[in-house]
Swiss-Prot record:
Gene: purE
Function noted in UniProt: Catalyzes the reversible conversion of 5-aminoimidazole ribonucleotide (AIR) and CO(2) to 4-carboxy-5-aminoimidazole ribonucleotide (CAIR). Does not accept N5-carboxyaminoimidazole ribonucleotide (N5-CAIR) as a substrate.
Molecular-function GO terms, alphabetical: phosphoribosylaminoimidazole carboxylase activity
Organism in which the protein naturally occurs: Treponema denticola (strain ATCC 35405 / DSM 14222 / CIP 103919 / JCM 8153 / KCTC 15104)
Name of the protein described by the UniProt record: Phosphoribosylaminoimidazole carboxylase
Catalyzed reactions per annotation: 5-amino-1-(5-phospho-D-ribosyl)imidazole-4-carboxylate + H(+) = 5-amino-1-(5-phospho-beta-D-ribosyl)imidazole + CO2
GO biological process: 'de novo' IMP biosynthetic process
EC number: 4.1.1.21
SUPFAM superfamilies from the UniProt entry: N5-CAIR mutase (phosphoribosylaminoimidazole carboxylase, PurE)
Amino acid sequence: MRPLVIILMGSSSDMGHAEKIASELKTFGIEYAIRIGSAHKTAEHVVSMLKEYEALDRPKLYITIAGRSNALSGFVDGFVKGATIACPPPSDSFAGADIYSSLRMPSGISPALVLEPKNAALLAARIFSLYDKEIADSVKSYMESNAQKIIEDDSKLKR
């Protein structure tokens, strides 16, 4: 069964960030679902969603998008069996202090923190590549392409 990434946003204002992640997941051939739920405002709704996804017999992980006070990432990570990747949206408010709510988690709660949407999708792909050859091949091709671009850019400077 093909892996699934559940992109869980704290609110609809995070849709642009979610779409960037989804676009990158497509390049790796990874199926995804985009959902909305707030750990602060709709905790029961989030639990219901997580139970639904956890019942699926397929590889899955969660990418959470929540700004301001990011309780969502820790909440999800504490509930699910697999990996959670926190990818909070950028914020200029309060000199970017929102990020601190994604950095410190209680013991036993360990969402990975990745700030760039493309890199959050790449981490998901790399996790799934451990047991999915198609995704592993996509990741390898992606990494080789990035490396080749650097080499080409360097060769232009050597002239």
